[in-house]
């Protein structure tokens, strides 16, 4: 039987397609098995497992971002590094030999220093921690495994993706490509709360299985902006281009300082609960320098030592998205064999050799006065008598959203033009 396999990352949503090497290049499926999230008695052990893989995931996040930036000098960037890493780590469970090593090393794991079991345990606890219910912060992740009704996958692979990556499994008829596409897109749309639609626009009828994975985030600022203070202001895309954007304004106390090393203003804004947004505004002509210099060590220093100061802050409201073909991006990080005829995915199915034909990632972000969810709040702050500086994010800037509990970079991006969707 011809085989192929698909996989997606979402709201970060993405899609990876596995095809036979012999080839040129609500849900309506039936649940095969429901996965129970493992119950852990020791929260401290969970966090420790997450934290052990956090440095590697951070290195991967910044390396991947730089690859995207090199291909995208004038466009907005938005992606979820942790979602991409999770998807490929999950796929690695079905790979062997050089294909296997390339994926984990491309995700910045040194297999001589960190046992593979420790890596997967870290992801297992990361997913469990991120999916803990919180009244103030909506952060949910999910994995869907869509299996062709005639396919015979390796039982251990099925067991591992369910137990370690909390994947749900569904039986599906991939020969009916339109119905299969609808099932996968419905799963993605539902999981992303309608933010990601029509992720899959075409599907190979020889597909054997699809791994779809998503993360959805809704957060409220600890210190929201007043809607009444939002005004239309200029945003300077480049020396020749200026656009009008709705600019949020607030006079108050912020974790804000000018970092001479990065030649940038650095703003940290906390969401209610465990997430923090970093906004980094480079000085004129220093954008590329900032992109090259930003590392996990610098990010950690910003968290360790905050600089509360008064300012009149101007931050644009925006909705941006990014769609990426990961084949070339990950190829530059050393992940190549899984996309080639040399791929060894015999841990997925032994029926016919497979390779990864497509890997797509799509992400969407909205920033507004309340965060990403409307809610009322009143902030009273004492402001120093001295005249506070005006800090305007009215030219290209970088940002990332970081989960303080798991120490994971959830999202990362660059705003070149807020009017560019």
Curated annotation (Swiss-Prot):
Pfam family, one: Serpin
Compartments in which it is found: Secreted
GO cellular-component term (any): extracellular space
UniProt keyword annotation of Metal-binding present: no
Task performed by this protein: Inhibitor of serine proteases. Its primary target is elastase, but it also has a moderate affinity for plasmin and thrombin.
Residues with Phosphoserine modification: 386
Entry-listed glycosylation sites: 73, 110
Annotated site, Reactive bond, chain positions: 385-386
Domain remarks: The reactive center loop (RCL) extends out from the body of the protein and directs binding to the target protease. The protease cleaves the serpin at the reactive site within the RCL, establishing a covalent linkage between the carboxyl group of the serpin reactive site and the serine hydroxyl of the protease. The resulting inactive serpin-protease complex is highly stable.
Organism: Sus scrofa (Pig)
Family assignment from sequence similarity: Belongs to the serpin family.
Keywords: Glycoprotein, Phosphoprotein, Protease inhibitor, Secreted, Serine protease inhibitor, Signal
SMART domains in UniProt: SERPIN
The protein, known as: Alpha-1-antitrypsin
Signal peptide positions on this chain: 1-24
Gene Ontology terms, MF aspect: serine-type endopeptidase inhibitor activity
Region described as RCL: 376-395
InterPro entries: Serpin_CS (IPR023795), Serpin_dom (IPR023796), Serpin_fam (IPR000215), Serpin_sf (IPR036186), Serpin_sf_1 (IPR042178), Serpin_sf_2 (IPR042185)
Subunit structure: Interacts with CELA2A. Interacts with ERGIC3 and LMAN1/ERGIC53. Interacts with PRSS1/Trypsin.
